[in-house]
Regions:
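Conserved C-terminal beta-signal and adjacent last beta-strands/turns
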Residues: 429, 541, 573, 654-769
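Membrane-embedded beta-barrel scaffold of Gram-negative outer-membrane proteins
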Residues: 354-358, 362-368, 372-378, 539, ...
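Short acidic/polar hinge/loop motifs at secondary-structure boundaries
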Residues: 158, 173-199, 218-219, 325
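Extracytoplasmic beta-strand/coil segments of soluble accessory domains associated
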Residues: 95-118, 123, 135-174, 193
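Acidic/polar loop-and-plug regions of large Gram-negative outer-membrane beta-barrel proteins
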Residues: 266-270, 283-289, 293-356, 371-407, ...
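Structural signature of Gram-negative outer-membrane beta-barrels, strongest in the C-terminal barrel
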Residues: 287-291, 407, 426-438, 472-597
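Outer-membrane beta-barrel translocator/receptor signature
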Residues: 177, 190-193, 204-284, 290-294, ...
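Gram-negative outer-membrane beta-barrel transporters
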Residues: 491, 594-596, 612-693, 766
């Protein structure tokens, strides 16, 4: 769990921190030499691997846009903008730039100058909390409805932002959804360097996307260290085991070729009886070009999950509501051992090419090919009992389902970036083009399963062979062209983005001999304004739009004529305040937002078509604080309130919560007999969540508060012979609170719930060099 921390800066790690560069002109004539050395000294933050989308060399093209700290004090903006032809480079050690993000603008921009809500989750924070999954990583962020599949649904990253499910990006490229939702890639969080949550519509730069935002992840890539590495072993409750290794350095003496290899072997039982997960993953990467103007990074990944827990739940009656027999235990399993299978193989190869033409213009392009194969088979409960009133009895109705899906995904994104002046205005221009393509083969099967006696369960019953009923071949592609202009005048920053997308899909179903075609063209845009006062305050306002293709048939004349559904349209108005204490990484953000999603499909009873008249509103307020006032103290806090309503039903959007709150802090003793000992803890509170309509009425999940704790110790402080060794431990849900994480209630059609994660403790020992 502490492997990442051992290789980084914060929390008293021993390894080399990121490198910061000082550009200092060399002059040789007269009195100008001393003056120039004072005026033109500039320092900027480097964010490779710590931004979700920007590659290593992007920092060189964006440096004169960012302010920072120097060893001698604050740097004036004019000096940071000035360039001398002959410069000498001096390396300076510094801390990770947790106050810089790239997802909002596709360039490395300080959060204090970003007119949109972005939550940054650093590698150090993930290590301090003992994070094992992306769901766990985002739990302390404002606006997140976490663990929508409870504590057992860990095979996918399932959470909502501002009431909406959001897509996931890795290294700037989208993980494409599969037609069934089962052949979806998952990234092991230990190979991640950083996670950003971009909140609100982002289609103006990324194409089809959710109005809630997106999740941006960044891989660990080669750094400028000559040789480094670490090995970490972790064990814990539910028979957790994992071994992680991360090794990198220079492949050539001059550093023109660099490498990094990450690998893991891990597994554990889940909190449900008779289920478990295993994973094998390796990710090699190479960077060619060193610190030159042209660099190429190649990144590969192969991951095999022979099993990955259960995807089942528990009936609402017996979990959220008391049944005639009482309540089901949290380890209740609704499936059957002989029919439980989840097998996923995923492979990917990525390239990132960057070229710097000069100090003003650069070009970058990246692409990824994914190949994902999933075999899934399960027996699951139907959400009700086979009894007269549905609330008594103990025989749980069940069915069986299976699918085999194979997806091939291509994604590319290329962009030119440049800086120009028009009078007093400074422009940061970007022109981009991206392309996505997918082919998916899927076969689905269905069958009956015997009822399960919940008081005396038999998990080895005879399950009949499944009957295939659907076989799809789906092909889709999206082309997008976009542009952006960040205009700066004194302390005012205006940003405008616009994009045109062309989307097509063709789905053929071979059992029913049907064909579904979609073709859409959509323009999306964003405009924002921010003013950065010199005392650290930045008020801002922004407006952004999004679109999402939908599958379905629509009629506006009672079924006389039919057409394919148009994409849903999202729009958001957001305003807020950001404050960063000058010269520190202490950042406070507050934002209010109003989101509308229109063109939502509304089904018409007893017909095969829908009306495209649905409208969803999401209104809320968020506050976050991220502070590292000292190198050995890290504090994060968040509060959010939201109201998400589906106008077609007059009810809240299902699985949308009313808000959350959290606080986490980690402190490392800097001196004394306990030097190197770190300890911390956190609280995360979830307000009520709407779970749909049950047979008895509206379902509301009660609020709950959970507590986590972490400790760590650098053994070098015990003995110099233990240099590089570190031990750590963490506990989630410290007091083992019994709670329901989420429910899906559809009246007589089924009522399901999911227990939240039980108390889960783990400990690790690691060595780094």
């Amino acid at each position: 769990m502490w492997l990442g921390a051992q290789l980084r800066v914060i929390l008293n790690t021993k390894d080399r921190p990121p490198t910061l560069w000082v550009q200092k002109p060399v002059t040789t004539h007269g009195w100008g030499m001393q003056r120039n050395r004072i005026i033109y000294t500039a320092l900027f933050s480097i964010v490779l691997g710590d931004t979700a989308f920007a590659a290593d060399q992007d920092r060189k093209a964006d440096t004169d846009r960012h302010s920072g700290k120097t060893a001698v004090g604050h740097v004036a903006r004019k000096s940071a903008e000035t360039h001398a032809k002959d410069v000498e480079q001096i390396r300076v050690r510094g801390h990770l730039a947790s106050t810089v993000a790239s997802s909002a603008t596709k360039s490395n921009t300080p959060l204090i100058e970003t007119a949109q809500s972005v939550t940054v989750i650093t590698r150090d924070e993930m290590d301090a909390r003992g994070v094992l999954t992306l769901n766990q990583a985002v739990r302390y962020a404002a606006g997140v409805t976490a663990d929508t599949r409870g504590g057992e649904g860990t095979r996918y990253d399932l959470f909502d932002l501002r009431g909406f499910t959001v897509p996931t990006f890795l290294d700037g490229l989208k993980f494409q959804d599969s037609p069934t939702g089962f052949a979806v890639a998952q990234t092991d969080t230990f190979r991640l360097d950083r996670v950003e949550l971009l909140k609100g519509p982002a289609s103006a730069l990324y194409g089809q996307s959710s109005p809630g935002g997106l999740t941006a992840m960044s891989s660990k890539l080669p750094t400028d260290q000559r040789f480094y590495g670490g090995v970490n072993a972790t064990g814990g409750m539910f028979d957790l085991y994992r071994v992680d290794a991360d090794v990198g350095g220079f492949a050539t003496d001059d550093g023109m070729v660099r490498y990094r290899v990450y690998g893991t072997i891990n597994g554990q039982h889940t909190q449900l009886s008779r289920t478990g997960s295993r994973r094998f993953s390796i990710s090699p990467s190479f960077t060619f070009g060193g610190d030159g103007p042209t660099t190429l990074t190649l990144l590969g990944n192969y991951q095999y999950d022979p099993e990955n827990g259960s995807y089942g739940g528990v009936p609402l009656i017996g979990s959220l509501k008391r049944a005639s027999y009482g309540y089901l235990p949290r380890n209740f399993y609704d499936g059957d051992v002989s029919a439980e299978k989840f097998n996923r193989r995923q492979g990917a190869i990525t390239y990132i090419l960057n070229h710097r033409f000069n100090d003003d213009w650069s070009f970058s392009t990246r692409g990824r090919y994914d190949d994902i194969r999933t075999v899934y088979r399960s027996v699951y409960d139907n959400g009700y009992y086979n009894s007269d009133d549905g609330t008594s009895g103990q025989m749980l109705s069940r069915s069986a389902y299976g699918t085999q899906e194979h997806t091939y995904n291509l994604a590319f994104d290329s962009q030119f970036k440049g800086k120009v002046r028009t009078g007093p205005l400074r422009h940061a221009l970007m022109f981009g083009f991206d392309y996505m393509q997918q082919k998916a083969n899927d076969t689905e099967a269905y069958g009956d399963a015997p009822d399960l006696d919940v008081l005396h369960p038999d998990y080895h019953m005879a399950i009949a062979d499944l009957t295939p009923y659907l076989r799809y071949v789906t092909k889709s592609h999206q082309i997008g062209a976009y542009g952006q202009d960040e205009i700066r005048w004194k302390r005012l920053i205006l940003t405008g983005s616009i994009r045109n997308d062309w989307y097509r899909s063709n789905q053929t179903e071979y059992f029913e001999q049907s064909n579904d075609r979609q073709s859409a063209r959509q323009i999306t845009w964003r405009a924002s304004g921010l003013y950065h006062f010199d005392f650290g305050l930045s008020p801002y306002i922004s407006y952004s739009t999004s679109f999402q293709p939908q599958s379905g048939t629509v009629s506006n004349d009672g079924g006389a004529t039919l057409r394919q559904a148009h994409p849903s349209i999202g729009k958001q108005l957001e305003g807020g305040l950001k404050y960063q204490i000058p010269g520190t990484s202490v950042l406070f953000t507050a934002a209010g937002f109003h989101i509308e999603q229109s063109n939502v499909l509304v089904s018409v009873a007893n017909t095969g078509y829908s009306l495209q008249s649905g409208l969803v509103h999401s209104d809320g307020f968020e506050f976050e604080a991220h502070a590292q006032p000292f190198h050995n103290l890290m504090v994060t806090a968040a509060v959010s309130f939201q109201k998400v309503k589906d106008d077609s039903t007059g009810k809240p959007l299902i699985q949308s919560g009313k808000g959350n709150a959290s606080l986490f802090a980690f402190y490392t003793m800097p001196s004394g007999p306990l030097k190197g000992f770190g300890f911390g803890g956190g609280m995360r509170y979830s307000n009520k969540t709407y779970g749909g309509e049950a047979t008895y009425g509206s379902v509301w999940l009660p609020q709950y508060a959970l507590f986590d704790a972490s400790i760590a110790y650098d053994l070098n402080n015990m003995s110099h012979s233990l240099h590089g060794w570190k031990v750590a431990a963490s506990v989630r849900n410290l007091f083992d609170r019994n709670y329901i994480a989420n429910c899906f209630a559809y009246g007589a059609d089924g009522q399901y719930c999911y227990y939240g994660e039980r108390r889960n403790a783990q400990a690790s020992i690691g060595y780094s060099w």
